Amino acid sequence: MKRQKIIFLNLYILSVFCFPATTVFAQEAALMPNIVIILADDMGYGDVSGLNIHARTHTPNIDQMIKKGVNFTDAHSGGAVCTPSRYGLITGRYYFRAEKKFDYLGYLKPLIDRNRETIGSLMQKAGYETACVGKWHLGLDWGLKSPDKPQIPLGDDKRSTNTDFTKSVTGGPNALGFDYSYILPASLDMPPYVFIENNRVIDPDIIFTADAYPRTLQSTKPVWDRKYTNADDIYWERGIWWRNGEMSRSFKMEGCFDTIVAKGLSFIAAHVTREPKQPFMLYLSLTGPHTPWLADKVFVGTSPLGSYGDFILEVDDAVQQVNAMLQRLDISDNTMVVFASDNGAGWAEDDIQVYNHKCNAGRRGQKGDIYDGGHHVPLIITWPSKIKKPFTVKSTMSLVDLMATFAEMT
């Protein structure tokens, strides 16, 4: 119990250090900070140039957050892969408590009970407008073409499912305290490749990815990623691959990241115009630098780390776009921006040898591992009106603790 209390105090060091509890926790909702959570996907601690003096990446905008805010040097995600980490962030609980575990890729059933408190419902009750934009990967209830048949067919061919994309998709963010949602069901290498806005698939005209993209390129080398096993999938080069499967006809793999960032910015601008006195919380869940490493053409070829490094630059640019929008709307002073990653980078020893870059800052393990490199993540928080000087917190904490921290503020 004593150890738990010590950990609890460490979790709230930001609140205690930055401002008097008696003056802030009693504020009216109109004076509470806006909150933007930017969650990178598979970005290692060592990918942030401000955290790794040997980094071959360049992240000037994330580095600026370090220079202006709180840098947690011993932060950990709730898991070493996507779903457990996101479950912990959204619910404030560790993933082993979830009744249901992994299912099939983007067709995962909802993992979070509708009656459970989440960061969305918590902040809703505190008077916030809440939004979830980007990668979800916590399960959804899909409508079926034939209710008496399983959604995923038996056998090896799981490309064509029993999913009716014209029907409402429930059990997601809107059922869990988010007023607005614009999501990708799972990772950008997992079908179905569709955008869902407030429970409706944007484009229900479904094709297969292999109908729109060549499985290989003329330049593709016959040396596949170690985890790549299915010759039916799309594979262009190291890190640029995704599973074949159902996809909206209008969906563009190479434009997904930009669409998510644009939707997040649009939510902020629309909210401030519509309800300037109401605080908002945006959970902006990016798809990069998770595979496929498909950076915008503006960034292609600009990094010494190949496609992966190009994608890191685009992630950093997304941070810049968010902060620029907050400044343009004159709300940056009272907006808390949280930047983190859902787990360590998937960066094998071969990659380290080829690029001379340690995504996970030399720590043992990588994404998917129980070792430190699998879950030791960057965590940086800025809040200009309250955090006047940058400082570093060396105490151990977890992204799971963010929900409790927000609860303490409301």
What spans do the regions from the language model cover?
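Terminal low-complexity, poorly structured segments
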Residues: 5-10, 35
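Formylglycine-dependent sulfatase
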Residues: 23-410
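Bacterial N-terminal signal peptides
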Residues: 8-21
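Positively charged n-region of N-terminal signal peptides that target proteins for export
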Residues: 1-5, 27
